[in-house]
Amino acid sequence: MEGIHSRTDFDLGNHQKFSGKKIQYFDPELGENYVPYVVETSIGVDRMFLAVLSNSYKEEQLENGESRVVLSIPAPLAPVKVAVLPLVKKDGLPELAREIMDDLKYDFNCQYDEKDSIGKRYRRQDAIGTPFCVTIDHDSINDRCVTIRHRDSMQQERVKIEDLHAIISKEVNLSNILKKLN
């Protein structure tokens, strides 16, 4: 995204006027002197990020009448890639959640959250654009599977803990966006 401003001869004309120095160009083909026009261009990453953020912000009405704020930022651009959420703060779930967090945190920016109900935690993560929430429940201890929730669709699927890294890597890889540009 770029800003382009045609300043005409305003800037150089005023500089010439107040400095007392001629800032003119002689065109030999036309045989005329004139003050050149200035075209000011401005480009920056900040404009791109503003466009992505503006386009990603959504307020959705859910079937149950509630609403949710979602920052549907593309997964490769999301600052936080995954949230690890034990269903409750007891029965060994936080310990397993911390193990999973320890496995993921070196490759992905992760958040750990055990405060409030699971629904409120999902909403908090939706609002900051976290593409994936991993929920550890009582079955996780025995079957070594967790529930991964996708932010945009709110769909949940049961996956093996050992497959989490590969699933998240595939989705947050920047090459996914780059391939769409071709």
Give the positions of each predicted feature.
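NTP/phosphate- and nucleic-acid-binding module
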Residues: 1-182
